[in-house]
């Protein structure tokens, strides 16, 4: 996949559920539609929670790297 232009990076390393998703929600609110938030996490629950959050809140999970920590998620605000 080509390079994704990230608007903001959110480091949630060391945080455990539900903190990473709460911070994603708080930070993505400040982005405009189409802007991209890169989330870096090491909580295994994020592999389930972040895709579910995107679906529920109508954001787009562009790409994720979840083979081994730290996990990375590129989330575009909106569809």
From Swiss-Prot:
GO terms for cellular component: cytoplasm. InterPro entries: Sulphur_carrier_TusA (IPR022931), TusA-like (IPR001455), TusA-like_sf (IPR036868). The keyword Ribosomal protein does not apply. One of its GO terms (molecular function) is sulfur carrier activity. GO terms for biological process: tRNA wobble position uridine thiolation. Belongs to the sulfur carrier protein TusA family. This is Sulfur carrier protein TusA. NCBIfam families: PRK00299.1. The active site is at 17 (cysteine persulfide intermediate). Signal peptide: none annotated. The keyword Cytoplasm applies. Disulfide bonds: none annotated. Keywords: Cytoplasm.
